[in-house]
């Protein structure tokens, strides 16, 4: 038995497979053939897409329904009638989850039957390339005009879905709109003309596609030359603000036309045209200000101007504020001009400068005018004294409390006599007795008294003898840098008690270190190289570094030389040193000599009498306690 041929076996088996009834049944089934529809002329399915995600969703297999999974859909829009096919690009559907952009296309009715049929992949690519080339080279290949969606009301989508029940006004509509002279506004907020209505009557196709695909062609889209469509960016001087379902009034002057609807926010405008604002409150206020307006029109501008006195501007319009308006009476109209308004009269020749509202605004343009505020605070001088249109009030206290810049605004009448406040009288027997002496010697002793040291007490409360002010019989003043001080006029009782306690222990505690024994007043400021015979030392000085040549040395200040009782070091007193005692030294008596004299007699009463006599004789000398107390009283009177 031979081996069968392999080729023969395979051929026989293949023939048997084709002749099988199963294979014949499969062949008898009708094949699925792709439908090749005719190419439409005016239907745009897509542009040249650059993103792979969008191209994969659009150009899918011909056997599948591309419109089922695609993000394209068709809408009917009957509210907009245009004379030619227009593609509207640039607005986002609010209800779409993919945030797609909208394209509105006008086509013939006979061309819409093939919209839902899929097209081959190659034809879709060729159509997109042809459309891109036609748009790039400016050819009108598919009879399509590109218009931004900003120029069309965005309530079209809502009308399609809800049957025209809901209406929304887009913010983009306030930026660009049509000329109200060429177009009419219907109740739905759609702009159209009679010519456009005659040519209309066809449905519109709405196709959605991605934002990224549209932005690539925003600069390639040719701008229309139709005079009915124009952009605000191309003609910035010609614009209008259109608002849906609002009555508006328009005024034209030059090439500027502005419309402001009721309830719209205030807008700062820099153009020179007149602006009309429709507001019931504004019109009511304008009727009251009819006599004040330079023109006969009963309109005003409710806005905030940040530049009141800008050069080259036209007439200022008075800014109104219901809370800050002054009453329109003869007082406010015939008010006397303030010096601030009279400083520069050259500006009033060209521009009419109106008063700035008395409000404090955001840009510091409403500060209170000092001249006006100062006039309101003036008080009336005489009852019934009036002037033709207003009454000026004046108060003497305002003259002293008003700053220098506002004193010129005060009005002073010739019949008013301004009395100066009377001088304060100081009572006291000691002050009355020494008043004549003070006037003569005050000028001589001020320099010496002003040069004395001031206290710097910290813990003594300025009630001890080592406080310079307390020991000199003076109160602490401003030059002192003491802390917790009680040596002040308000604590006078406490100061006097402290002095009495110290005098009880040492009667000579507050006595000057140099006293005069003569009954006549001797000029001690005459330069003399010798110690006067009429002076005697009680304690002496304790100078260390000054050399007794400065005025805080007691001996040098009183014009006497230092004695043996002085404990100074390096004495250079020009009135006499310790070793330069002259013939007049016999007249100088030290405390030790007085102690010996009092000790010999042993009479304490005589000692007190002599001390009192010496105190009476030194009352008229500068630097004494009485003289210093007199100076302190004069200082208190000035306070």
Swiss-Prot record:
Does the record's keyword annotation contain Nucleus?
Answer: yes
**According to its UniProt record, where is this protein located?**
Nucleus
One GO cellular component assignment for this chain's record is:
nucleus
UniProt region (Disordered), positions on chain: 282-301, 313-347
The segment(s) forming the CRC domain are: 451-576
Single Gene Ontology BP annotation: regulation of DNA-templated transcription
InterPro entries linked:
CRC, Tesmin/TSO1-like_CXC, TSO1-like
Where is this chain compositionally biased, Polar residues type? 329-345
* Any one GO molecular function term: DNA-binding transcription factor activity
Major localisation: nucleus
- Keywords for the protein's UniProt record, in alphabetical order: Developmental protein, Metal-binding, Nucleus, Zinc
Q: What does this protein do?
A: Plays a role in development of both male and female reproductive tissues.
The text of the family note is: Belongs to the lin-54 family.
Question: Which PANTHER family does this chain map to?
Answer: PROTEIN TESMIN/TSO1-LIKE CXC 2, PROTEIN TESMIN_TSO1-LIKE CXC 3-RELATED
Domain comment (free text): The cysteine-rich domain CRC binds zinc in vitro.
Q: What is this protein called?
A: Protein tesmin/TSO1-like CXC 4
- From which source organism is this entry? Arabidopsis thaliana (Mouse-ear cress)
């Amino acid at each position: 038995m031979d081996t069968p041929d392999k080729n023969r076996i395979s051929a026989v088996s293949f023939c048997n497979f084709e002749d099988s009834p199963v294979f014949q049944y499969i062949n008898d089934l009708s094949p699925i053939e792709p439908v090749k529809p005719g190419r439409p002329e005016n239907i745009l399915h897509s542009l040249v897409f650059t993103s792979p995600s969008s191209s994969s969703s659009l150009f899918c297999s011909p056997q599948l329904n591309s419109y089922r999974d695609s993000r394209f859909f068709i809408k009917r829009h009957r509210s907009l009638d245009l004379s030619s096919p227009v593609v509207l690009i640039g607005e986002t559907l609010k209800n779409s989850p993919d945030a797609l952009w909208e394209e509105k296309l006008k086509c013939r009715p006979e061309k819409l039957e093939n919209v839902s049929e899929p097209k081959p992949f190659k034809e879709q690519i060729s159509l997109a390339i042809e459309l891109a080339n036609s748009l790039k080279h400016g050819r009108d290949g598919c009879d399509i005009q590109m218009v931004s969606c900003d120029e069309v009301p965005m309530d079209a989508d809502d009308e399609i879905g809800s049957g025209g029940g809901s209406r929304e006004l887009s913010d983009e509509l306030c930026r660009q709109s049509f000329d109200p002279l060429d177009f009419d506004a219907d109740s739905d907020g759609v702009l159209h003309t009679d010519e456009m209505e005659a040519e209309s009557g066809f449905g519109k196709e709405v196709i959605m596609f991605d934002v990224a695909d549209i932005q690539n062609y925003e600069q390639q889209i040719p701008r229309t030359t139709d005079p009915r469509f124009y952009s605000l960016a191309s003609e910035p001087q010609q614009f209008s603000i259109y608002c849906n379902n609002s009555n508006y009034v328009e005024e034209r002057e030059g090439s500027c036309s502005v419309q402001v609807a009721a309830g719209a926010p205030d807008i700062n405008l820099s153009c020179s045209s007149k602006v009309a604002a429709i507001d019931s409150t504004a019109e009511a206020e304008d009727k009251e200000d009819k006599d004040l307006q330079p023109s006969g029109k009963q309109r005003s501008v409710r806005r905030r101007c940040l530049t009141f006195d800008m050069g080259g501007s036209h007439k200022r319009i008075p800014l109104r504020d219901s809370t800050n308006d002054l009453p329109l009476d003869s007082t406010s109209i015939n008010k006397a001009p303030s010096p601030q308004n009279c400083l520069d009269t050259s500006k009033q020749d060209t521009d009419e400068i109106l008063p700035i509202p008395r409000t404090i605004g955001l840009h510091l343009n409403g500060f209170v005018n000092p001249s006006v505020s100062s006039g309101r605070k003036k008080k009336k001088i005489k009852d019934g004294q009036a002037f033709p249109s207003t009454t000026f009030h004046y108060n003497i206290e305002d003259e002293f409390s008003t700053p220098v810049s506002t004193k010129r605004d005060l009005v002073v009448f010739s019949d008013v006599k301004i009395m100066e406040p009377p001088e304060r009288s100081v009572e006291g027997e000691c002050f009355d007795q020494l008043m004549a002496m003070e006037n003569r010697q005050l000028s001589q002793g001020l320099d010496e008294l002003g040069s004395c040291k001031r206290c710097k007490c910290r813990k003594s409360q300025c009630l001890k003898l080592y406080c310079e002010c307390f020991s000199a019989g003076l109160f602490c003043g401003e030059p002192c840098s003491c802390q917790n001080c009680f040596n002040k006029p308000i604590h006078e009782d406490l100061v006097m008690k402290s002095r009495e306690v110290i005098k009880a222990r040492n009667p000579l505690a507050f006595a000057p270190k140099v006293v005069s024994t003569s009954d006549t007043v001797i000029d001690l400021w005459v330069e003399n190289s010798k110690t006067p015979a009429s002076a005697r030392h009680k304690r002496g000085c304790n100078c260390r570094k000054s050399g007794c040549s400065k005025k805080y040395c007691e001996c040098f200040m009183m014009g006497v030389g230092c004695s043996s009782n002085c404990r100074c070091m390096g004495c250079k007193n020009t009135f006499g040193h310790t070793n330069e005692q002259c013939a007049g030294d016999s007249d100088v008596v030290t405390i030790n000599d007085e102690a010996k004299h009092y000790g010999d007699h042993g009479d304490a009463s005589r000692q007190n009498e002599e001390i009192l006599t010496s105190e009476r004789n030194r009352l008229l000398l500068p630097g004494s306690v009485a003289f210093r107390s007199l100076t302190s009283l004069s200082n208190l009177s000035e306070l």
